Swiss-Prot record:
The keyword DNA damage applies. It comes from Methanococcoides burtonii (strain DSM 6242 / NBRC 107633 / OCM 468 / ACE-M). Interacts with UvrB in an incision complex. This is UvrABC system protein C. Keywords: Cytoplasm, DNA damage, DNA excision, DNA repair, Excision nuclease, SOS response. GO terms for biological process: nucleotide-excision repair; SOS response. It is found in: Cytoplasm. The keyword Cytoplasm applies.
Length: 604
């Protein structure tokens, strides 16, 4: 049934199409609301299939009158962003220039990077074209001002402080170690850096760097040098304004469902960065020029507007969009289609990158579909009640029981989720006992999961035979957890399934995709266990008594051990012998001798 549109005025504004359930399904803007809305209900021969489908669902039309076309364009963009109607072109993954956000409107403010600038009472700095020095500055702020960066709630309930507090990178407001007033003062000191007031901090850092350099502590000096460079880069970005050679190049590539957008950021005539985004076609299937226009309207709501925007094709309402962008930027803005020269070459490069992003998306989708089929096969082969979308794999690595480490890897939808990997330094088992080590690791993992009420895996895979499987099952039974668990032994790739106190062996063809999933999880857990064990062993071997002597870092320790071969020889070396080593000054040699002399006296 056609909605009543007789009372819609012939004025500029925004119209909202609603379905029978009063859901907004499309938002548009018009110079004349009455004329534009009427067009939807006239002959449909010029409408796309999606537009015809949308019109059939329209049960009501609401509208908002604005003072001008530009005001209508701005309101339309804001309403689309807020409501995300089904038939509008939807910017899916909006990767904008980063800002630094300071939540000054909270009791204990945080400082962090964000891609969106909201009207939420917080303080924002940026946008920054280069995020690396911003991250370096935030790391430095953690060291100097000890500002909270984790997501813990600060509710005054006296939580135990996290690691950042113990390494002097946070004042731990979560457990009341600092008052709100003291903490806020610290935050406002840090804020000065983002306001460009960096000269005092840079001067202090340069003095510290010189002290380390004089003491030949070159590694410490290099760290401070990098901090100074980051601050200078941050300051340059903060004070930079758009120059005449600044432009954004927007290119697209598309398939039947999605439009992939590539933006090249050109600043001072040089390419300083790029971003990939994607949009749905909405009701504009096949009309790249219109999709590009909609992208510009959504993207530049809160992204910095350069003097020039280069596009592949002329956009439908170019003059209106230019007027809006120029008002927003408070200067002239141009939208051009490059015809020749360097700009044309850069556009072709952006088009090529957009096409590559499209092809990579197709490959990823194909990988996901193959992984799903493999998981379905695995579910059937092991007679699981649910799809094993979340698999956790365990392995143990040690040398004769020393530096023993257990690993846990996570696969989600058949693919590794690296950020969720964990390693466990073995604590309770002495000597060579892989079974007991496996029992410890599994128990520690799921004791924590049970206590935190975290989601449990759909399947546990143990790298090993019946002994390891039995040990792991024992831990699960102790915790009263019923999680499907299997083992995969390397030699024959037989799957061990514990059932009612016995082990059932499932043999799958080596070509089976289900078996390949388990092998990938098993091999990854083994790799991660070995690498974790090596790190632990290296850390133990590299730690020595020299680490307790001020002025000896990694490079000097290495030089001393290369020269003397052992700590014992260094212990009995004279000042003259020590100064023969590159990087060891007379003062440092005297400190080394004094350290070992003191040790000998204490041991007498």
């Amino acid at each position: 049934m056609r909605p009543d549109i007789s009372n819609i005025p012939e004025l500029p504004g925004v119209y909202l199409m609603k379905d029978i359930s009063d859901n907004i399904i499309y938002i548009g803007k018009a110079k004349s609301l009455k004329k534009r809305v009427s067009q939807y209900f006239q002959s449909s021969k010029n409408h796309s299939s999606k537009t015809r489908a949308m019109v059939r669902k329209i049960a009501d039309v609401d509208y908002i009158v604005t003072e001008s076309e530009v005001a209508a364009l701005i309101l339309e963009a804001n309403l689309v962003k807020k409501n995300r109607p089904h038939y509008n072109i939807d910017l899916k993954d909006d990767k904008r220039y980063p800002y630094v956000k300071v939540t000054v409107n909270t009791k204990f403010p945080k400082i962090f990077i964000t891609r969106r600038r909201l009207m939420d009472g917080a303080l924002y700095f940026g946008p920054y074209t280069n995020v690396k020095p911003v991250r370096q500055t935030l790391d430095m702020i953690s060291q100097i001002f000890r500002i909270k960066r984790c997501n813990r709630r600060v509710d005054g309930k006296g939580k135990r402080a996290c690691l950042n507090y113990h390494i002097d990178r946070c004042y731990a407001p979560c457990n009341g170690s600092i008052t709100p007033e003291e903490y806020r003062n610290n935050v406002m000191e840090a804020v000065k850096l983002f306001k460009g007031e960096t000269s005092g901090t840079i001067k202090e850092l340069q003095e510290k760097m010189n002290i380390h350099a004089i003491a030949q502590e070159y590694e410490s000096a290099a760290v401070i040098r990098d901090q100074i460079d980051a601050l200078k880069s941050l300051s340059r970005q903060q004070t930079a304004t758009a120059g005449n050679d600044d432009s954004d190049i927007i290119a697209t590539a598309s398939d039947d469902e999605t439009v992939f957008v590539q933006i090249f950021y050109i600043r001072d005539g040089n390419m300083v960065g790029k971003a990939d985004m994607s949009l749905s076609w909405g009701d504009a299937t096949g009309n790249i020029a219109r999709v590009t226009e909609e992208f510009i309207k959504q993207y530049y709501q809160d992204a910095p507007v350069p003097p020039e925007i280069l596009v592949q094709y002329p956009i439908p309402e170019k003059e209106l969009v230019i007027k809006w962008l120029s008002e927003k930027a408070a200067r002239s803005v141009q939208i051009q289609v490059p015809q020749r020269g360097n700009k044309k070459r850069l556009m072709e490069m952006a088009e090529q990158n957009a096409q590559m992003t499209l092809e990579q998306s197709h490959l990823k989708q194909s990988d996901k579909e193959q992984a799903l089929q493999a998981l379905l096969q695995l579910r059937d082969a092991l007679a699981l009640s649910t799809l094993p979308a979340h698999i956790e794999g365990f392995d143990i690595s040690n040398i004769s029981g020393t530096d023993a480490v257990g690993s846990m890897v996570v696969f989600e939808n058949g693919l590794p989720a690296n950020s969720k990997y964990r390693h466990f330094n073995i604590k309770t088992v002495k000597g060579i006992d892989d079974f007991a080590m496996m029992a410890e690791v599994v128990k520690r993992r799921y004791t924590h999961q049970k206590a935190e009420k975290d989601k449990l895996p759909d399947l546990i895979l143990i790298d090993g035979g019946p002994g390891q499987v039995s040990a792991a099952m024992g831990s699960l039974k102790e915790l009263q957890l019923d999680i499907p668990l299997v083992g995969l032994a390397k030699r024959f790739e037989h799957i061990i399934v514990p059932k009612d106190g016995t082990d059932e062996v499932v043999i799958l063809p080596h070509t089976s995709e289900a078996l390949k999933v388990l092998m990938r999880v098993r091999d990854e857990s083994h790799r991660f266990a070995v690498s974790s064990h090596r790190r632990r062993r290296t850390a133990r071997l590299s730690h020595s008594e020299l680490d307790t002597i001020p002025g000896i870092g990694a490079s000097r320790k290495k030089a001393l051990l290369n020269h003397f071969s052992s700590i014992e020889q260094i212990r009995h070396a004279s000042v003259e012998e020590l100064t023969a080593v590159e990087g060891i000054s007379k003062g440092l040699a005297e400190r080394i001798v004094a350290h070992f002399n003191k040790e000998r006296v204490e041991n007498q």
